[in-house]
Amino acid sequence: MDGASFEERGEGWGEGRVLAMKPLALFGGTFDPIHIGHLTVAWEAAELLDAEVRLMPANVPPHRSPPLATPAERVAMLRAALAGQSRLVLDARELERDGPSYTIDTLRELRAEQGERPLVLLLGADAFAGLPGWNRWRELFDFAHVGVLSRPGVDALPPAELAEEAAARRVDDVAALRAEPCGKLIELAVTPLEVSATRIRELLAAGRDPRYLLPAGLFDDAALLQPYRR
């Protein structure tokens, strides 16, 4: 990183005490680049939970190759993508850390900041099925609820140890997430779009224009997508 401060932390959302216990949902990823598939499921989760959703770009993801775009470039794309609305918010704290981005560290930090406010970690069905491979995965439930973004009619089969853990924590009513700060699991039926960031990068590298796979704001400044054209 170039030493610039990534100031977006999302503090101050919702003035007054009335909104204090609304859930805060967290949606992580490399966002390399941010595309309409990310935004669609994040927006629907925000509606289903009646929550703010923070998009949290990872610095060095432990389970995949490093992003092609730099942290500053990904932040610029996210800012452009999220302009004009207030329900989806950028939180770039993980980019300020050195080394791998471990979710447990982020949740610990957010819990210290948010007190008893319910936190909801949003995971795609495939990511959830791979949860036992995450660093200290069982401890995640000590700091947040987990919301699994599921495709209607499609069930991802988790391994036995995760299925057992999930069965004891599963709830069907979003209201149950507001009653406690952490520890529950809920499935959220969203409309996933089969959009591939890898394919988008390939198209851009070939000089193509994947206009309707990316948020419109990314085309307002040609420099935003330059990381994938060089």
Indicate where each model-derived feature is located.
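Cationic, low-complexity basic patches in intrinsically disordered or flexible, solvent-exposed regions
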Residues: 9
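Nucleotidyltransferase catalytic core that binds NTPs
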Residues: 16-230
